[in-house]
């Protein structure tokens, strides 16, 4: 059977709800990416709705292989939904935000409004300080997808909205500027299936 990849956006937490860019990982300090009561409740509801199906898989009961972004919030989301053995995968990592890491959107809107506007509209824009553009993310995600065999085990991948946008646009062969037209909320699922000509975006059944 063709490979199917189930992409899951990680849970929201206090930092995400406050509109704060993720900080650079610091050994032993994942406070900004910790789950809170609201995210734990949302994850429990997601697990009730989705995990039995995904743990069972769609190949006569064969469970998919689980992967996760290296980010603590993605790993915690995988663990809380029954995929504790998910392996870390760098291709699923969040966008690198450079000097914007740890900053609030509201503060950037005051301090650097033109740069923030460019980031929301231009897929080639890189945040200062070594940040990644959407085009950069799309290139790494597209390379990861295209390296997969046409037939292989299904995958479930806990990742970030930017990675999911990149994967969907890669599957569709759509221009990167279309990233503005895709909204992905926390704990949403997108499915991609391998095909002879590339990838097909499947409507995930909730």
Listing of model-derived features with the role each one plays in the protein:
Residues 1-5, 46, 57, 88, ...:
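Acidic, low-complexity terminal tails and accessory targeting/binding regions
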Residues 4-5, 64, 151-162:
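Generic beta-sheet signal
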């Amino acid at each position: 059977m063709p490979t199917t990849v189930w992409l899951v956006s990680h849970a929201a937490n206090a930092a995400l709800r406050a509109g704060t860019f993720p900080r650079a990982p610091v050994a032993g300090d994942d406070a900004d990416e910790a789950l809170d009561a609201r995210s734990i409740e949302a994850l429990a509801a997601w697990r009730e709705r989705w995990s039995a199906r995904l743990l069972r898989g769609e190949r006569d009961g064969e469970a998919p292989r689980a992967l996760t972004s290296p980010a603590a919030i993605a790993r915690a989301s995988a663990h809380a939904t029954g995929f504790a053995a998910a392996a870390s995968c760098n291709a699923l990592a969040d966008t690198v935000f450079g000097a914007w890491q740890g900053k609030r959107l509201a503060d950037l809107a005051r301090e650097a409004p033109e740069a923030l506007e460019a980031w929301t509209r231009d897929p080639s824009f890189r945040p200062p300080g070594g940040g990644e553009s959407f085009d950069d993310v799309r290139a790494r995600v597209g390379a990861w997808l295209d390296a997969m065999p046409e037939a292989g085990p299904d995958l479930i991948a806990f990742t970030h909205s930017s990675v999911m946008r990149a994967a969907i646009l890669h599957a569709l062969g759509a221009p990167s500027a279309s990233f503005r037209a895709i909204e992905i909320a926390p704990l949403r699922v997108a499915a991609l299936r391998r095909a002879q000509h590339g990838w097909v975006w499947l409507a995930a059944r909730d």
